[in-house]
Amino acid sequence: MSELKNGTTEPKKNETTQSDSKSKSTSTNKSSVPPASLVPVQPTALTSRDKTTQRLIVVLSQACLETYKMNSGGPGGDRFALLNCDDHQGLLRKMGRDIAEARPDITHQCLLTLLDSPINKAGRLQVYIQTARGVLIEVNPSVRIPRTFKRFSGLMVQLLHKLSIRSENSKEVLLKVIKNPITDHLPTKCRKVTLSFDAELKRVQDYVTTLDENESICVFVGAMARGKDNFADEFVDEKIGLSDYPLSASVACSKFCHGCEDVWGIY
């Protein structure tokens, strides 16, 4: 500090006053908080109780989600694993079962595709899983499915034994087993379709435009490696084709999401 003629002091060039420091700190803190207009608004998640909002509903049918007891007793108690064709080939042969029956990875791929989609983030998507053994599962749109298959397997084992998975923070139910049939959980006005390679080919965008203003659409997608397309015949109104080529379940889910997004203006 240097002394002036009137007895006051003047800060040096490299020194800052305490008030300057406080003002800079305050401005820094303010700038770290985004304006309200920049904070994304999380849409309200759809539930089966909402019977009127137009939406896309995807039912992953014949999903291969089955647990197997690896050992019993011991200090850790019973241990279960999600049956899959990579880790349990010998076991499947011993049981006389086709390896293709144990493909839970297909359900995993479909869930990642669906829950990552813009239509889900916009609050216009509902997802259900119907296992090959007839267990019906409701998927909360806000659930974060594990990216790795190993962690996904552990989550599914926990779900199938506890019947529900809750968020650790808010205690919100993220996954739960619900009562059949699926039609009890669909909107009042809902067109139900399933996909078939032998059905008439339709462009998803064109098909969605034929819906009434408040009519939802429910698509049954086979979440299995191979099999007949009659898994939803008791529920559906019609069958449609999406491509001249065989599609994986994940790609079929993606095409329907994109089609609805285009028609409903979701970007």
Swiss-Prot record:
Catalyzed reactions per annotation: a pseudouridine in rRNA + S-adenosyl-L-methionine = an N(1)-methylpseudouridine in rRNA + S-adenosyl-L-homocysteine + H(+)
Q: Name one GO biological process term.
A: rRNA base methylation
| Site residues by UniProt (Interaction with substrate rRNA) | R103, R144, R147, R151
As recorded in UniProt, its EC number(s) are 2.1.1.-
As for subcellular location, the record says: Nucleus, Nucleolus
Name the family: Belongs to the class IV-like SAM-binding methyltransferase superfamily. RNA methyltransferase NEP1 family.
Q: What is this protein called?
A: Ribosomal RNA small subunit methyltransferase NEP1
What organism, scientifically named, is this protein from? Answer: Candida albicans
Source taxonomy: Eukaryota, Fungi, Dikarya, Ascomycota, Saccharomycotina
